[in-house]
Amino acid sequence: MSAEAFSQCLEAQAAAIARRQGPDVGVDPETMRTRVRSGRWQRLQRGVYAAFSGDPARETVLWAALLQAGPGAVLSHQTAAERHRLIDEPSAIITMTVPASRHPAQVKIPGVIIHRSDAILQTRHPAMLPPCTRVEDTVLDLIQIAPSFDDAYAWICRAIGRRRTTADRIRRAMDARKKMRWRRELVTAIGDAGEGALSLLEYRYVHGGGTLARAPLGAPAGANQAAYR
């Protein structure tokens, strides 16, 4: 066993390891099975283990799902929003995206929603681990499945209001997409959010013919006030 390679693998993946990775780090499948039977390791997904006993951390669970999904998989949508701190509580369901070349039947994981995309290389964050979509593309993915434009705009407000990204970055990411729901409305909405209209009330007031008194520099996001005449 290559102790260094094995240790590095576990450290990089929050102590999750796939059976297929064993030969690369000097651990044979029988050794893995023995450790699971002895209770030193535990099975998290089919062919994926946690190299410890006890309750797995959230990051270990996410890594296990990604390893089960196979090469190229990234966390996306609500789970990516969790990683980017756009939501405060993790969902019981993990959401990820795999390359479009993967057949849906090849990627069926209990408790996981799978999307497919041919643009993963462009939308994947260059540094985050576990692999995850960029915050701008996470927002756009959530907009694509939003039940209404109000819900879509709320994601934009949240991302900008929490200072996770900017209006310009969201706009550039949207320009790179061939298909986008509510594209025309979103162009306007992104501009409004960039100007400080970080709530649906403010957005509707602006487009109802009113104006907004801009909040002082440094005021909390969404602190603009309607200026009635």
Please describe what each predicted stretch is.
Residues 188-203:
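A short, highly charged nucleic-acid-interacting micro-segment common to nuclease
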Residues 219-229:
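Short acidic loop-to-beta-strand element that houses the catalytic metal-binding Asp/Glu
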Residues 1-184, 200-206, 213-219:
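Short gly/ser-rich loop at a beta-strand->alpha-helix junction or flexible surface loop bordering the NTP-binding
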